[in-house]
Amino acid sequence: MTESEFWALVTRTSPQQDQTELADALKQKLSLLSNDELRDFDKIFGQQMRRSYSWSVWGAAYVITGCDSEYAFAEFRCFLISLGQEWYDKVVESADELGKLELWPEKDGYAYPFVDEYDLIAGQLYEERNDDELPYVPSGQATPAGKKFSHKKKQLKATYPLLSAAFPF
């Protein structure tokens, strides 16, 4: 599987697409893949999850939603991946770029940039088919890359001016 094929599979149809619809669409697409392709897909997904495991990206999640747990941050990174390669690469390079995203999935009238268990779909399909798990791929570093973001409002506004304007706190 190429990275282009991977991104074609994971990219949502619109930024505000419903999370359940998004996960169902990915599951349907992945069900057509061979076991080898599922392994390749899972490997690339893991690589992208590790690539976005940084304090600067976590700081963006914090500004948008107050994201303060590893689990929520993993769901946020799944959301970034679901935006597609162009948005994903921009945000990994400069997390404040996410402030330029105009449409967001919502829950109770608030931005909800999380996709629950999007990263597990390939593994679940593989297990259903084979009664075995996908090969284990180490997750990488124990802590996010880079310098931890400051929780101080003044510093957050300076570091994430676009996001702070879009999501005032």
PLM region spans:
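N-terminal domain-start signal
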Residues: 1-56, 154-168
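Phenylalanine-focused residue identity feature
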Residues: 6, 41, 45, 73, ...
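Long, solvent-exposed, polar/charged low-complexity segments
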Residues: 7, 130-169
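Secondary-structure junction/capping motif
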Residues: 18, 69, 112-116
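An amphipathic alpha-helical core segment
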Residues: 101-149
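Core of folded catalytic or high-affinity ligand/protein-binding domains
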Residues: 28-106
